[in-house]
Regions:
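Short beta-strand segments
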Residues: 1, 19, 104-106, 157-158, ...
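Glycine-rich, acidic loop regions that bind phosphate or pyrophosphate groups
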Residues: 1-61, 197, 212-215
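General structural feature for long, well-ordered alpha-helical segments within catalytic domains
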Residues: 11, 19, 36-40, 44, ...
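Beta-sheet entry/capping signal
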Residues: 14-15, 100-103, 153-155, 179-180
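Thiamine diphosphate
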Residues: 25-26, 32-34, 38-42, 112-216
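Charged, low-complexity, helix-prone segments enriched in Lys/Glu/Asp/Gln
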Residues: 54-79, 145, 181, 187-199
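Active-site diphosphate/adenylate-binding microenvironment
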Residues: 65-146, 151
Length: 216
């Protein structure tokens, strides 16, 4: 994502946007390419021919990647906190995973943590549903991924809100002998949706367990 455009602070940057929809491709004054992403990238590669970025630019990218990895390792490393953060939980699983393990996530704050901390070491080992915060896709999607990759471990990161929405597919995975590793993190309910609700001027409406109208 753009980080509310904080990722593009250089006033001289140029944006090339590939999209099947002309309206979306032209947003933010981008140089538009209307077409399928894979086909468009292949044609762009052919058009570029032997062109390469400068060695100075390659060095900068390597240095920035090294700095980023060091930062992520530090922030997601072992902790003495009474309760580990999302970053600590994802980091612990990542460090103990195999390169072929597949990570799945979809909704809430876990998406942001997983895409930063889970740095794939093999192709097709990271599935994240960004688009519309598809709560509970983490479970049904993980089941489908396991069915397609029976010889790999599938690890899905789930908040308690998504878990309550669609835990029945965990049962489906068990009875069909499709093993899943489900990491359920306590978020007190749908905390991210609650935050969005409040930031837009609304009031809490049964998003958090503590503010829901439940009997004792």
């Amino acid at each position: 994502t753009t980080g509310s455009w904080s990722n593009f602070e250089n006033p001289n940057f140029s944006l090339v946007s590939i999209n099947v929809a002309r309206f979306d491709a032209s947003k933010h004054m981008a140089q538009s390419i209307i077409g399928d992403a894979k086909v468009s990238l292949n044609e762009l590669s052919q058009a570029l021919g032997d062109w390469k970025a400068s060695e100075e630019w390659h060095k900068k990218s390597r240095d920035e990647l090294k700095s980023w990895n060091e930062y992520v390792d530090k922030e997601s490393g072992p902790t003495n906190q009474k309760l580990p953060s999302y970053a600590h939980a994802v980091g612990a699983i990542y460090r103990n995973s195999d390169p072929s393990d597949i990570a799945v996530t979809a909704a809430g704050g876990l998406v942001g943590e997983v895409v930063q901390i889970w740095r794939p070491r093999e192709l097709n080992t990271h599935e994240t549903e960004w688009g519309f915060s598809c709560m509970s896709y983490e479970i049904s999607g993980a089941l489908g991924i396991k069915m397609a990759n029976p010889n790999k471990e599938v690890i899905t990161f789930v908040g308690d809100g998504s878990y309550l929405l669609y835990n029945s597919d965990i049962y489906s995975s068990v009875i069909t002998n499709n093993k899943l590793i489900v990491i359920v993190c306590d978020n007190g309910g749908h905390a991210v949706i609650n935050r969005l609700q409040l930031f837009k001027g609304g009031k809490e409406f049964n998003c958090l367990f503590e503010s829901s109208n439940v009997s004792n």
